[in-house]
């Protein structure tokens, strides 16, 4: 009560913020008339002057009114579009690093040109992030006319570009692209071997379109680049064959809310019998446990045509938020293979993670981040807590006159679908266009089938038909059109009303089910009533819908029984609607906690990732790596000889002596580097009563490095860089796998009264320290086993040109080392499959002789 009185007197926080921007608005409008008289060349020349001033230290805020006024004028001249005052306010909010909540049809695409042009003057680059390649291309071309008029360069990052094209796009003042392309380019840059191969610049300023979709909906899906692992796929089929013989609730239980499945004690015994195992929980059977759980999820939780479809004998993921197909993306942890086995298609090899990052941590790297969406207010707390972003509600240019009708609730799904079809037929007969929103392909096809029987013409837009998306969306506002769309397919394209449609009541939005998130429901409503157009929305629900069945509790069903509902009769009751909204709030809270927990765990990995990528970048950029290599040498020798220091002059016991000797041999190949130390076996112990001194070992290894430097000539620096980066990448890849295993089992620590997050942090740090140490040692294991033939040493002078050519070829190979073979990409939602990049050089088998020339098998030498 008191809060509402205070709000009436002083206005809300949002109102006060908008009021504080009035002085900017007055200045911009005051400049409009004067700038309208300037020739085209004078405007671009003035922008060039302002760019120079900014790079000399002038603040962006001080020139904001003038730049915004020039962008407005550019819009009028090249597009015939003038930025409204409310769009100016949205632009100021974006420049200030906030989220601008703007209703559908209010011109978010045009708003972004204001802060983009202003911040481009810093010369550090502005990234405009969209949800798919189509929008990235469209906006870059469409809005690019404004930027080009102002003398600013524009690039676009879409799937299929080579590194040179990407580098040019990132070098532009303003770069459009999808969240996935930006994220994957960052990961790929951190797998490159030479600074000339990098494509991205440092992360300066990003404007994220549909920010709720990217930073909230996709926050749980990390971007992953992976390569093939050695694990066999036969086990997936073997386990899949036993799942139909297990009975739900007897042999296994399913938690639909948590989307998890688990074997019961009886189920464990049955699985052991069917698989011929003595003990499923024996450590050697750990892979069986993992495969059984994934197969149970594949059969009992994941549904065909809802979570995925089978297309061209492949399992293709359907994005739960947009309804789009995600070709080239795969579920992780063997779940995708379990689905392939379930559907009887080819089971692809499981992949091992080479690099990964969540969108949460990727976007937090930007110095300044802002975003636009039509629906952010319900997630304002999460934006504030996770990203430190404030949501500003921007008023509409024209009043909203759309009618949002109360939900119609039925007892059963068949009753609901019959009512939906009757309502669609009524509206079609009237001539009012209808957009039917469904949350699965299955539902969209069910309604389409019912409409076909009733003779109602319609278009279906779901993951299976998304190639026709633009054409179908363009027609959706025409009189008499019926369009069935899975979720928010077609988002980003406004539905324009046809002639005479406003008089019929505008676009009618019919929701067939409530989504777990109120925001997704609001997005569907937002397709109607754009720019002051009339419109109407209504949701049709049933007690058998997943949301009400899982989260609505029995109170709603009891309430509806007391109200005495008859078959086929709907109810429109505020108490029921409120109960449904509370169910959605509970699910939203649950999903927020999941995302927060994911971030807590990923923050541990993120800190480690930052250290590794920084070390990698320094190694790539450094011209002289010899000091780093010698520093590694000092650290290793000090560590190896530490037990000797601790004895304080006393004789070493035999076990410690043998351990030091073995480590010297393993790390430095000392029997080659320091021939006097030719430890062949335990009988050799008597011949070497004393270990070589630390100084002697250091001198011997440094001597080896000097010889390597002479033999390698000008490519010595490339050799050091190659091995430093190669060993860093190999150890990081193994560390990612170890961290995955740690994460999988860490939840069990809670049963021992220990905090799983703290345990993960502590053990993760220990693993990371071990990995850093392993990098140092593995670099020397590789370098001391490397054999190079000097050109001058060729036996036949006639062979010298060939030897020289070989050395030149090796240098070129080192300078242009490719990324790992057969990379796979997963995470996020993007149109178009990722084509795996392949290495042309033959892969070295684990039992082949090591190419370094040591004479050992690869798996016992550089592949160890």
UniProtKB/Swiss-Prot annotation:
Binding site for Zn(2+): 850, 852, 861-862
One GO term describing the cellular component: plasma membrane
Enzyme Commission code: 7.4.2.8
Transmembrane segments: none
Class of this enzyme: translocase
Function: Part of the Sec protein translocase complex. Interacts with the SecYEG preprotein conducting channel. Has a central role in coupling the hydrolysis of ATP to the transfer of proteins into and across the cell membrane, serving as an ATP-driven molecular motor driving the stepwise translocation of polypeptide chains across the membrane.
Quaternary structure, from the entry: Monomer and homodimer. Part of the essential Sec protein translocation apparatus which comprises SecA, SecYEG and auxiliary proteins SecDF-YajC and YidC.
PANTHER family attached to this UniProt entry: CHLOROPLAST PROTEIN-TRANSPORTING ATPASE, SECA INNER MEMBRANE COMPONENT OF SEC PROTEIN SECRETION SYSTEM
Protein name: Protein translocase subunit SecA
Species, as recorded: Oleidesulfovibrio alaskensis (strain ATCC BAA-1058 / DSM 17464 / G20)
Upper lineage: Bacteria, Pseudomonadati, Thermodesulfobacteriota, Desulfovibrionia, Desulfovibrionales
Gene name of the record: secA
């Amino acid at each position: 009560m008191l809060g509402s009185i205070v709000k009436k007197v002083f206005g809300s926080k949002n109102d006060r913020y908008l009021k504080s921007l009035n002085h900017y608005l007055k200045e911009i409008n005051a400049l409009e008339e004067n700038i309208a008289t300037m020739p085209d060349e004078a405007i671009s020349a003035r922008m060039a002057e302002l760019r120079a001033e900014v790079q000399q230290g002038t603040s962006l805020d001080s020139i904001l009114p003038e730049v915004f006024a020039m962008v407005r004028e550019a819009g009028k001249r090249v597009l015939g579009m003038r930025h409204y005052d409310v769009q100016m306010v949205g632009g100021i909010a974006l420049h200030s690093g906030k989220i601008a909540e703007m209703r559908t049809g209010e011109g978010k695409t045009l708003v972004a040109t204001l802060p983009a042009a202003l911040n481009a003057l810093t010369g550090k680059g502005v990234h405009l992030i969209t949800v798919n390649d189509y929008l990235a291309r469209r906006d870059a071309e469409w809005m690019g006319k404004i930027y080009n008029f102002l003398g600013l360069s524009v690039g676009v990052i879409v799937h299929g570009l080579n590194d040179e094209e990407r580098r040019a796009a990132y070098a532009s003042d303003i770069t459009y692209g999808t969240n996935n392309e930006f994220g994957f380019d960052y990961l790929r840059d951190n797998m490159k071997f030479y600074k000339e191969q990098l494509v991205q610049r440092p992360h300066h300023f990003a404007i994220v379109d549909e920010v709720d979709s990217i930073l909230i909906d996709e926050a749980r899906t990390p971007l992953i680049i992976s390569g093939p692992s050695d694990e066999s796929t036969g086990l997936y089929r073997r386990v899949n064959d036993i799942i139909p013989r297990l009975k739900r609730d007897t042999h296994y239980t399913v938690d639909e809310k948590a989307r998890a499945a688990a074997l019961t004690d009886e189920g464990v015994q049955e699985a052991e019998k069917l698989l011929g195992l003595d003990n499923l929980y024996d450590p050697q059977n750990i892979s069986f446990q993992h495969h059984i759980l994934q197969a149970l999820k594949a059969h009992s939780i994941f549904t065909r045509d809802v979570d995925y479809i089978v297309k061209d004998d492949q399992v293709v993921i359907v994005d739960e938020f947009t309804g789009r197909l995600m070709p080239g993306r795969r579920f992780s942890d063997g779940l995708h293979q379990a689905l392939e086995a379930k559907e009887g298609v080819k089971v692809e090899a499981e992949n091992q993670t080479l690099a990964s990052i969540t969108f949460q941590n990727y976007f937090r790297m930007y110095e300044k981040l802002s975003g636009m969406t039509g629906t952010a207010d319900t997630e304002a707390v999460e934006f504030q807590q996770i990203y430190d972003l404030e949501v500003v509600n921007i008023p509409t240019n024209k009043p909203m006159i759309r009618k949002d009708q109360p939900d119609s609730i039925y007892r059963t799904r068949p009753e609901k679908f019959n009512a939906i079809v009757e309502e669609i037929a009524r509206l079609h007969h009237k001539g009012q266009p209808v957009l039917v929103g469904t949350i699965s392909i299955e539902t969209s096809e069910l309604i389409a089938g019912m409409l076909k029987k009733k003779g109602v013409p319609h278009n279906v837009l779901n993951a299976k038909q998304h190639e026709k998306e633009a054409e179908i969306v363009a027609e959706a506002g025409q009189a008499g059109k019926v369009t069935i769309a899975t979720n928010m397919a077609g988002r980003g394209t406004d539905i324009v009303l046809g002639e005479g449609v406003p008089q019929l009541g505008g676009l009618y939005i019919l929701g067939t089910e409530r989504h777990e998130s109120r925001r997704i429901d609001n997005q569907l409503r937002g397709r109607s009533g754009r720019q002051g157009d009339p419109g109407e929305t209504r949701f049709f629900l049933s007690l058998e819908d997943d949301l009400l069945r899982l989260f609505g509790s029995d109170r709603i069903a009891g309430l509806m029984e007391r109200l005495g509902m008859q078959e086929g009769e709907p109810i429109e009751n505020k108490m029921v609607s409120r109960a449904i909204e509370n169910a959605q709030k509970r699910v939203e809270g649950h999903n927020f906690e999941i995302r927060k927990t994911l971030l807590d765990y990923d923050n541990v990995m993120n800190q480690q990732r930052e250290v590794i990528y920084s070390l990698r970048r320094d190694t790539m950029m450094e011209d002289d790596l010899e000091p780093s290599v010698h520093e590694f040498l000092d650290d290793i020798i000090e560590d190896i000889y530490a037990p000797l220091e601790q004895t304080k002059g006393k004789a070493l016991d035999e076990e410690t002596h043998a351990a030091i000797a073995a480590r010297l041999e393993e790390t430095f190949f000392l029997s080659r580097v320091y021939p006097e130390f030719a430890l062949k076996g335990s009988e050799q112990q008597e011949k070497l009563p004393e270990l070589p001194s630390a100084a002697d070992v250091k001198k011997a290894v440094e001597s080896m490095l000097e010889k390597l430097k002479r033999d390698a000539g000008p490519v010595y620096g490339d050799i050091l860089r190659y091995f430093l980066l190669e060993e860093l990448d190999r150890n990081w890849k193994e560390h990612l796998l170890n961290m995955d295993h740690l994460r999988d089992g860490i939840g069990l620590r809670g049963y021992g009264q220990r905090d799983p997050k703290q345990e993960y942090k502590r053990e993760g740090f220990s693993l990371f320290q071990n990995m850093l140490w392993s990098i140092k040692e593995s670099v020397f294991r590789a370098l001391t086993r490397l054999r190079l033939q000097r050109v001058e040493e060729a036996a036949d002078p006639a062979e010298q040109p060939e030897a020289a050519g070989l050395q030149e070829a090796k240098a070129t190979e080192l300078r242009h080392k490719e990324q790992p073979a057969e990379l796979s990409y997963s995470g996020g939602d993007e149109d178009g499959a990722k084509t795996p990049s392949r290495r042309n050089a033959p892969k070295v088998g684990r039992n082949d002789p090591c190419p370094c020339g040591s004479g050992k098998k690869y798996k016992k030498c550089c592949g160890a």
